[in-house]
Amino acid sequence: MYKIQLVNQKEGVDVTINCPGDQYILDAAEEQGVDLPYSCRAGACSTCAGKLVKGSVDQSDQSFLDEEQINNGFILTCVAYPTSDCVIQTHQEEALY
């Protein structure tokens, strides 16, 4: 079980959730009452984008982000499994472009 801190000062988000390594971060957040943006839930759009501040994830199921965006730390929370404790900035769709 990993601890995932979700933060976004502008949106008033600062909460830590528990997420097993076999559950998508978005699903775990919803189960624990955290309302995050999403649309397709399939890794094919950018609505749920977050930025990994600390930690690591497996998001091999995503098909939207390009290599540069991934190297800059962007993740899609709807298809990202945690592989360590993480700090993630939420609501990052606009920052992608």
Swiss-Prot record:
<keyword id="KW-0408">Iron</keyword>
<dbReference type="InterPro" id="IPR006058">
    <property type="entry name" value="2Fe2S_fd_BS"/>
</dbReference>
<comment type="subunit">
    <text>Forms a complex with heterodimeric ferredoxin-thioredoxin reductase (FTR) and thioredoxin.</text>
</comment>
<dbReference type="InterPro" id="IPR012675">
    <property type="entry name" value="Beta-grasp_dom_sf"/>
</dbReference>
<keyword id="KW-0934">Plastid</keyword>
<comment type="function">
    <text>Ferredoxins are iron-sulfur proteins that transfer electrons in a wide variety of metabolic reactions.</text>
</comment>
<dbReference type="Pfam" id="PF00111">
    <property type="entry name" value="Fer2"/>
</dbReference>
<feature type="binding site">
    <location>
        <position position="45"/>
    </location>
    <ligand>
        <name>[2Fe-2S] cluster</name>
    </ligand>
</feature>
<keyword id="KW-0479">Metal-binding</keyword>
<protein>
    <recommendedName>
        <fullName>Ferredoxin</fullName>
    </recommendedName>
</protein>
<dbReference type="InterPro" id="IPR010241">
    <property type="entry name" value="Fd_pln"/>
</dbReference>
<dbReference type="InterPro" id="IPR001041">
    <property type="entry name" value="2Fe-2S_ferredoxin-type"/>
</dbReference>
<comment type="similarity">
    <text>Belongs to the 2Fe2S plant-type ferredoxin family.</text>
</comment>
<dbReference type="GO" id="GO:0046872">
    <property type="term" value="F:metal ion binding"/>
</dbReference>
<dbReference type="GO" id="GO:0022900">
    <property type="term" value="P:electron transport chain"/>
</dbReference>
<feature type="binding site">
    <location>
        <position position="78"/>
    </location>
    <ligand>
        <name>[2Fe-2S] cluster</name>
    </ligand>
</feature>
<dbReference type="GO" id="GO:0009507">
    <property type="term" value="C:chloroplast"/>
</dbReference>
<feature type="binding site">
    <location>
        <position position="40"/>
    </location>
    <ligand>
        <name>[2Fe-2S] cluster</name>
    </ligand>
</feature>
<dbReference type="InterPro" id="IPR036010">
    <property type="entry name" value="2Fe-2S_ferredoxin-like_sf"/>
</dbReference>
<keyword id="KW-0249">Electron transport</keyword>
<keyword id="KW-0813">Transport</keyword>
<keyword id="KW-0411">Iron-sulfur</keyword>
<keyword id="KW-0150">Chloroplast</keyword>
<keyword id="KW-0001">2Fe-2S</keyword>
<dbReference type="GO" id="GO:0051537">
    <property type="term" value="F:2 iron, 2 sulfur cluster binding"/>
</dbReference>
<feature type="domain" description="2Fe-2S ferredoxin-type">
    <location>
        <begin position="2"/>
        <end position="94"/>
    </location>
</feature>
<dbReference type="GO" id="GO:0009055">
    <property type="term" value="F:electron transfer activity"/>
</dbReference>
<feature type="binding site">
    <location>
        <position position="48"/>
    </location>
    <ligand>
        <name>[2Fe-2S] cluster</name>
    </ligand>
</feature>
